[in-house]
């Protein structure tokens, strides 16, 4: 089946235009290999984890702040470095006046407590003796005008004082219980902290080994992705080359079709020309015979009409028009294209396309040996990681560190047990004394309630005086309890104040300001047995303050402790040599695509034969000259019709019969000879025009295409290697990213968790939280609230004694106003006494 030249040329030109140039090499998009996975590493469990303690906020924080401000007023002196130095190094040479000078605020408070301890019991004894003789604390003798105002004022002051006592008692109860509940965990936290610090250095090698073992995580991930690297690289090459290969194969297919069309038309041209020449040899004698007979018949004397002369003219022109023996020969071209095409271009293109589409599988098969070598190199462990734990220089420092902390732990246990024991005694005594204050508060409140009830009941003449008397007795009972518990209260307050206040002002305040660290760093301040820098194994050029700050910032152990400075974490984490070996193995991979030929040898021979055939040199105009001529110069069908008309006009039957016979034979000759030749001429015309339009461009395109394919086959391996190299670099970058994730994770784990000295600073911070926040703050708040209640017992005693007088019944009544009125009227009558 032939094709229209108008459709073939644009298709061929487009396909060739796409195939003539190879795309420039560009760097492949690494995203085509897929998303980089985020590796999940198991958190290395620490044998002893030291969690930082944080002071929890609560409703008592404002009270703690008030106590601290009070203590800052009591103790205005700075940290006594010289006094503490003397006390630690030569206790016998400590001067009392220096201690008193530093503790001046506490001495003043001690004087106040002493006065309280002396005066309150004496006052209580005197009041007791006075009450026994019924000379004080009695009742109101007479009623007067200002009595109600005095009584109301005293009751209000007593109520306010009682409320203050109640608030202080509640706070004392709360802080007492909070102190006791915090002491147990605080005492327990001290050995736990020391135990955790003992493993600060000794546990590092074991944890480093656990870190090194997790190198298998990136190894497994890389090994998993290596299984599909061949197919992935093949897909990358396929995607990059398909914009080149597919147009080339389309051009091959189009050229094959054009070649087939050209040969088909060339063969048709040759066959048709031969057939036309043969047909003309058979057509010429009958045409010539008809011409001669018609001329002889029509040139007779009877043919004198106009119609006859016209027919005579047509008969005279009855001869062959085209001479196909004059057409150019095409035998040489046909000879050159003999047996062309030998290749089935459609099948060849499908095979090449299938080969190209199987490129990922082909690359995967070729990559098997390379992947095996890469996995072999991958299975090894870098030298630095193998020595990560063994090279850690912590054995000597760990021994010294552990011995120091173990000794400190052993020495601290008896003291901690005593602290817990004495705290229990303090808690019991605190509960008893808080209960005593509660008893005073209850007596005051009940006394006030009954006393006020009794006052209202006096308006009734039939009232009983028992309510007021009971209220007064309850108030006096509260006074008795106040005198009774004043001594243990002031003693407990002063002892706890002296201990807790000095802990806060001497230790906690200097700890927060850093003066305590500076004191420990100053040479000579501590005795040789308490050389903390030596015991802790700190570097000689690093002070405790510097060690604390560096550890707080996350410094590693070998930067602070006396370890071997040759330990270099970055050197152990340098896996460049390991990854370089993997890169070399993978970069040595080359793809062999000999099976991808694009143009088979036989197809090339067909196209080269077409190129050498001289198809474009055929003189197609020579064919068109003969084609444009008619087969017979006269229209034989019209001539036959003219003869029929002329025959009908004749009277001579013989002449009429002859004309009709000629007309019939002309029609028969036309149908049998001329019409088939005209069909052959039409066929020849189509082939000639197709070849004339197709041959020049086909020759040029074939030549260009062969040059392009030759160049492409030379450049394609280079292009493939370039694409493969870029894709391999992308893959290696991706895989090296997994090792980078591991190195980053190891560096963070080692410097921030495993080999960091941060637990040292955390232990110091925890010590401050334990001593100052968990113990000292509630302890100081307890004595503050208890002291508050203790000193408010004095106004409570005074107001209770004063108020109780007004609750007892009045035995005598003296009213100046009523007496005067009685004297004016001179009416003798019995007056009732208001009790």
Curated annotation (Swiss-Prot):
It is a multi-pass membrane protein. One of its GO terms (biological process) is negative regulation of pinocytosis. The modification Phosphoserine is found at residue 819. Glycosylated. It is found in: Apical cell membrane; Basolateral cell membrane; Cell projection, Microvillus membrane; Cell projection, Cilium membrane. Its main location: membrane. Binds cholesterol. This is Prominin-2. It comes from Mus musculus.
């Amino acid at each position: 089946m032939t094709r229209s030249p108008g459709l073939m040329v644009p298709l061929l030109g487009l396909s060739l235009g796409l195939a003539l140039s190879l795309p420039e090499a560009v760097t492949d998009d690494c995203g085509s290999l897929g998303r980089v996975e985020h590796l999940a590493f198991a958190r290395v469990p620490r044998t002893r984890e030291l969690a930082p303690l944080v002071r929890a906020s609560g409703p008592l924080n404002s009270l703690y702040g008030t106590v601290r401000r009070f203590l800052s007023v009591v103790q205005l002196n700075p940290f006594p470095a010289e006094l503490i130095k003397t006390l630690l190094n030569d206790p016998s040479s400590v001067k009392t006046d220096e201690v008193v000078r530093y503790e001046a605020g506490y001495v003043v408070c001690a004087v106040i407590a002493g006065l309280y301890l002396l005066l309150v019991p004496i006052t209580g004894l005197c009041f007791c003796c006075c009450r026994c003789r019924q000379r004080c604390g009695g009742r109101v003798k007479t009623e007067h005008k200002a009595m109600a105002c005095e009584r109301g004022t005293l009751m209000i002051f007593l109520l306010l004082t009682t409320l203050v006592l109640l608030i202080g008692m509640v706070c004392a109860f709360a802080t007492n219980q909070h102190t006791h509940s915090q002491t147990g965990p605080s005492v327990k936290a001290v050995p736990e902290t020391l135990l955790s610090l003992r493993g600060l250095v000794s546990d590092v090698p074991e944890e480093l080994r656990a870190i090194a073992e997790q190198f298998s995580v990136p190894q497994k991930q890389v090994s998993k992705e290596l299984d599909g690297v061949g197919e992935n690289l093949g897909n990358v090459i396929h995607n990059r080359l398909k914009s080149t290969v597919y147009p080339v194969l389309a051009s091959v297919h189009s050229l094959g079709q054009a070649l087939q069309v050209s040969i088909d038309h060339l063969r048709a041209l040759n066959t048709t020309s031969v057939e036309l020449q043969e047909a003309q040899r058979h057509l010429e004698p009958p045409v010539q015979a008809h011409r001669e007979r018609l001329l002889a018949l029509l040139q007779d004397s009877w043919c004198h009409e106009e119609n006859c002369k016209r027919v005579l003219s047509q008969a005279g022109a009855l001869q062959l028009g085209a001479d196909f023996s004059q057409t150019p020969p095409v035998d040489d071209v046909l000879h050159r294209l003999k047996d062309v095409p030998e290749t089935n271009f459609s099948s060849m293109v499908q095979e090449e396309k299938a080969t190209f589409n199987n490129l990922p599988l082909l690359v995967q098969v070729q990559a098997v040996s390379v992947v095996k070598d890469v996995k072999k190199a991958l299975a090894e462990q870098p030298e630095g990681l193998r020595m990560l734990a063994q090279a850690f220089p912590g054995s000597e420092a760990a021994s010294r560190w552990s011995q120091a902390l173990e000794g400190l732990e052993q020495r601290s246990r008896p003291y901690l047990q005593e602290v817990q024991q004495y705290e229990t005694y303090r808690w019991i005594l605190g509960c008893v004394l808080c209960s005593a204050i509660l008893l005073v508060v209850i007596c005051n409140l009940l006394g006030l309630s009954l006393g006020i009830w009794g006052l209202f009941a006096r308006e009734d003449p039939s009232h009983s005086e028992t309510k007021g008397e009971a209220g007064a007795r309850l108030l006096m009972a509260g006074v008795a309890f106040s005198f009774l518990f004043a001594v243990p209260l002031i003693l407990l307050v002063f002892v706890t104040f002296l201990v807790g206040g000095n802990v806060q002002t001497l230790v906690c305040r200097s700890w927060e300001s850093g003066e305590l660290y500076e004191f420990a760093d100053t040479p000579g301040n501590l005795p040789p047995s308490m050389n903390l820098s030596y015991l802790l194994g700190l570097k000689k050029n690093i002070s405790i303050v510097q060690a604390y700050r560096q550890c707080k910032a996350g410094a590693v152990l070998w930067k602070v402790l006396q370890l071997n400075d040759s330990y270099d974490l970055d050197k152990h984490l340098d896996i460049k040599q390991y990854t370089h070996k993997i890169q070399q193995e993978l970069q040595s991979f080359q793809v062999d695509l000999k099976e991808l030929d694009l143009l088979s040898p036989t197809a090339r021979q067909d196209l080269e034969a077409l190129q050498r055939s001289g198809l474009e040199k055929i003189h197609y105009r020579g064919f068109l000259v003969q084609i444009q001529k008619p087969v017979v110069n006269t229209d034989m069908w019209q001539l036959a019709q003219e003869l029929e008309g002329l025959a009908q006009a004749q009277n001579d039957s013989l002449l009429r019969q002859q004309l009709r016979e000629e007309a019939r034979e002309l029609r028969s000759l036309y149908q049998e000879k001329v019409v088939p030749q005209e069909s052959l001429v039409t066929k020849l015309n189509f082939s000639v025009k197709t070849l004339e339009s197709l041959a020049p461009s086909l020759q040029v395109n074939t030549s260009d295409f062969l040059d392009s394919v030759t160049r492409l086959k030379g450049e394609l391996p280079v292009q493939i290697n370039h694409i493969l190299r870029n894709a391999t670099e992308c893959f290696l970058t991706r895989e090296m990213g997994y090792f980078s994730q591991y190195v980053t994770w190891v560096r963070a784990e080692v410097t921030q968790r495993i080999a960091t000295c941060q637990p040292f600073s955390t232990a110091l911070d925890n010590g401050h939280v334990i001593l100052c926040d968990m113990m000292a703050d509630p302890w100081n708040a307890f004595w503050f609230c208890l002291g508050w209640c203790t000193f408010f017992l004095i106004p409570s005693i005074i107001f209770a004694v004063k108020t109780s007088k007004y609750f007892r019944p009045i035995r005598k009544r003296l009213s100046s106003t009523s007496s005067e009125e009685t004297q004016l009227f001179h009416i003798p009558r019995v007056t009732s006494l208001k009790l």
